[in-house]
Amino acid sequence: MEPTRVEVAYCEGWDAAAHAAFRPLKEQTARERHSTGRRYAALLSIDAEPRALIQVDTGAGYVGVFSFDLAGRRSLKFSYRDLGDHLMLRELKAWRHVDDDEPEFGADLRITFRFWPDEPVRATLDDARRGQFTSYVKLPGPLHRIPLLEFGRWPVDGWLLGAFEPLEFVTAADPEREAEGPFWAPWSAPEGARPTALEALFVPGARIRNGQGDVFEVREPRAVGKLRLPTGRIVAADPATVELQGEQAVAPYTVTLTPGEYAMETARMRTAGRGTDMVAAARVRVSEEPVATWELALRPGQDERLLGASEFFGFVVDSGTAAFMDASAVDALAAYQDADDAEAAEATIPGDGVSELLTFPSGKGDGSYPVWIGRDAVGSVTCLVADMRLLGRGVEVDAPGSSARNAMATARQVPGIAQLEVHDVAGIEAFSSQGILEFFNDTADAQAEFWARRMGR
């Protein structure tokens, strides 16, 4: 059988309005970006019809694959993350259109599968009429792991492209010239949550404005006390529900401190014109050195590379109260909350010997909150900050006086240390869409039918 000819054109992305590649690139430009960690895209076409769009950002460890439907819309998306020795499918999303007139990404039914290593797949159906339905299903085998991406060897096959195999990839002619000048990028790799104005939260008199037009006035930080860390292993958790949260939820962070006592304080602010203070953050001070970098605090088994857009690994609060504590306090506190072990725990909580914890109000109440690690210019830990995420997006800061502005000079963010368990990837096979898409479609159809029966057609 004659191979199916697949033309590959390089570009910045896809222009849905023009139904064409956006800002075409020369092949050599794309190669250079691939090797230097800069983003680019590859448009795959058969007989001048787009069949797939590959988005690559090797610097961010991201590969996205869009498949086009017969109406020329991007209707299926694979999102992969580079875990060092293989690519892992993190998300698979489909837009199920009823007719050809529905706009791209405007389908009434959206289906999203989220993948984690060694955990069930979270399947979410978003129906514009019936609402949202989420369930968990077991993935039959490691269908979500594929080899690392090499330039020119794209994670597509005939099943995904709607073509007969074998496939023959042919590079399109280079554009005569590449567009120059600034432009609004049509896509970016998913990026986890970032710390927002953490330094400014502890500068009295600073004014912070967010993208919604809210203006916050920063108050004087309030000292909470000395946090005693006999083991140097620190935990952030809801002190009222430690016994219920499970080992992973209350595991100490992978960063360790020298055993000792550390000052803890809360950042307070109020909305301009109002008289009620809010706790915006809690900080454990390790040194007085300025923060040069921020990184997300991680527990064993957590890997920042798996986070989606604006996601974070946080600690959960169900009682409106949060706490920093030493790891040695967790078992004693859990025993205190367990009626069977209450008597045994009484000698330890509150106690004055081996453990201690300090509590603070958790922002607006229950939720999940990240902890950020601040490091100085030489990499030493200067503080840990529990962020109550009250500021929102589009933050601008105005601080009084040069000393205050220097104190809140914005530190850059760096990736946290990956804590994902090592997996045996020797058996990983080349990309094949059939197995994962059959699983996806069968599961989605079954759950959509179940949901329709339950909710009423």
What does each model-found stretch correspond to?
Residues M1-H34, R96-F183:
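Long terminal segments
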